[in-house]
Amino acid sequence: MARNGPPGRGRSSLPFCLSRGVNCGQSRGMTQPDYQLEAALAAQGHIRIAGVDEVGRGPLAGPVVAAAVVLDPGAIPEGLNDSKKLTAARRERLYDILHANAQVSIAEASVEEIDALNILRASHLAMERAVAALNPAPDFLLIDGNLIPAGLSCPAEAVIKGDGRSVSIAAASIVAKTWRDRLMVDLAQQHPGYGWERNAGYPTKEHRSALQNLGVTPHHRRSFKTVHKILYQE
């Protein structure tokens, strides 16, 4: 299901990079994504270019989440980067700024879909849903990774390690991770003891120990080996 973003947690201001062909937020000695891929596509006549990324392939619990983001080339937030390289506080600030200054779509594939389809196909399904929910539709996609989901309706390019190369993909990675982290905090309140507010469902020692002691919840992925073994006492 495609969704709008969760309520913002206060407005924040970060500087904007207003030039198309530069490294937004580039600091000396640091490598950050830039607008070069998007600028090359714009030179070919593509107007609405969406970056697409997903988060949550590795966790034992919770959905996989994808985001699609169309940036305004005149208002690109400074500091966009691979979400894993940013602090949670920085991601939260950029999340709110992106919702205010870009077109953003978020979608999920559920635990049930992950178990029925496999995690790769479920990840692609979430991406397809996020893209389909963009209105107006994009005319080109930059997809993080080396595979292009089969169900997309417009041209796309797969970009390996794209969240470190393209600001549009970096923006999508920030949006997807922030949404999913918030979701796992909410689920942690419903199912205390697994540490989801800290580990986001990933197989940390704390999480695996809680699985042994507390058992499997409806939000655990039964097709994942660690969960399957505990569920069926293998």
From Swiss-Prot:
Superkingdom as given in the UniProt entry: Bacteria
Classification via InterPro entries: RNase_HII, RNase_HII/HIII, RNase_HII/HIII_dom, RNaseH-like_sf, RNaseH_sf
Cofactor(s) the record lists: Mn(2+); Mg(2+)
Cellular component GO terms, alphabetical: cytoplasm; ribonuclease H2 complex
Major subcellular location class: cytoplasm
Major enzyme class: hydrolase
Domain RNase H type-2: 47-234
Catalytic activity: Endonucleolytic cleavage to 5'-phosphomonoester
A Pfam family annotated for this UniProt entry: RNase_HII
UniProt-listed Gene3D superfamilies: Ribonuclease H-like superfamily/Ribonuclease H (3.30.420.10)
Keyword Cytoplasm: yes
Function: Endonuclease that specifically degrades the RNA of RNA-DNA hybrids.
UniProt family annotation: Belongs to the RNase HII family.
Name of the protein: Ribonuclease HII
Native source species: Ruegeria pomeroyi (strain ATCC 700808 / DSM 15171 / DSS-3)
This protein's encoding gene: rnhB
